[in-house]
Design a protein with these regions (language model features):
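Membrane-helix interface segments
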Residues: 13-14, 90-92, 133, 164-169
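Transmembrane alpha-helical segments in integral membrane proteins
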Residues: 62-76, 80-81, 151-167, 228-246
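Secretory targeting signals
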Residues: 26-64, 69, 96-162, 172, ...
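Alpha-helical transmembrane segments
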Residues: 15-26, 108-109, 231-232
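Terminal transmembrane helical anchor/hairpin motif
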Residues: 32-47, 169, 173-251
Length: 251
């Protein structure tokens, strides 16, 4: 089944979509790195990470929705769903394999990006890879990965339940906008909005001190990792129990 998924994914340009997402992330990373005050910034890693997370807040839902749409859409062509079901394969198993493949691609992309972030942060003399920083890196790496996987699962559910061909892409844009809105309006809503979770792990807080703003580090947010894992578990349970699917769509 794994080899079959790889064969089906050929020609879908999944890697091209991931490359575009990487280019967007790289742009945000380099913007933070190239600022005039970066070399003297007290929190170089946090500075780059926050730029990376802020851009991910809007673009990741759209990119991940596009990836999910591509791998589901291929099944709708040439009656692939019916063919595989007739061979004894369950729709749930096919979906889980697709989710695994996309999650691995996102995981590999994220490893490369985070290594690059750490490498660039190390260019600042204030960067010190102490226990607290290592803990923050590990927790937020896992949190970011969990958020991405939870969105893959959510878009898979939307794609398999929706009858409209472009609904999931429209939903991803609305979701991305909702993430930005909740970031600007409510910490509580950001914490429960699956598309606003990136905003809850921003590292730097700006506090007004007279006429200037000073930077302080936020405490590590462990709750977001827990919430994203809950979304993953609930989505997997939902997919496993699905008994009605939309295997073709209206334009």
């Amino acid at each position: 089944m794994k080899n079959l998924e790889i064969k089906k994914n050929k020609g879908l340009k999944l890697n091209f979509t991931i490359l575009i997402l990487f280019a967007i992330h790289l742009f945000s990373i380099l913007i933070a790195f190239k600022t005039k005050d970066f070399q003297v910034n007290e929190y170089p890693l946090a500075r780059i990470l926050d730029s990376y997370l802020a851009i991910s807040l809007f673009f990741n839902p759209i990119a991940l929705s596009s990836l999910v749409k591509k791998v589901i859409e291929i099944e709708e062509k040439n009656n692939m769903w019916q063919m595989q079901i007739s061979l004894g394969l369950k729709v749930q198993k096919i979906l889980i394999d697709k989710i695994k493949n996309l999650s691995i691609k996102v995981f590999l992309l994220q490893i490369f990006e985070w290594l690059l972030i750490i490498f660039l942060a190390n260019k600042n003399t204030n960067f010190d890879l102490d226990v607290e920083i290592i803990k923050r890196i590990i927790i937020y790496f896992l949190t970011t990965l969990s958020i991405n996987i939870s969105m893959i699962l959510i878009f898979t559910i939307i794609e398999i339940k929706s009858k409209k061909i472009y609904f999931s892409l429209f939903f991803s844009i609305v979701g991305a906008m909702s993430g930005i809105i909740t970031m600007l309006t409510s910490k509580v809503l950001s914490q429960i909005n699956p598309f606003g979770l990136f905003a809850t792990i921003l590292n730097i807080n700006y506090v007004k001190d007279g006429q200037v703003y000073t930077q302080t580090m936020n405490n590590i947010n462990y709750l977001t990792l827990l919430i994203s894992l809950i979304y993953i578990i609930l989505s997997l349970i939902y997919i496993a129990r699905l008994n009605k699917f939309t295997l073709s769509k209206d334009i």
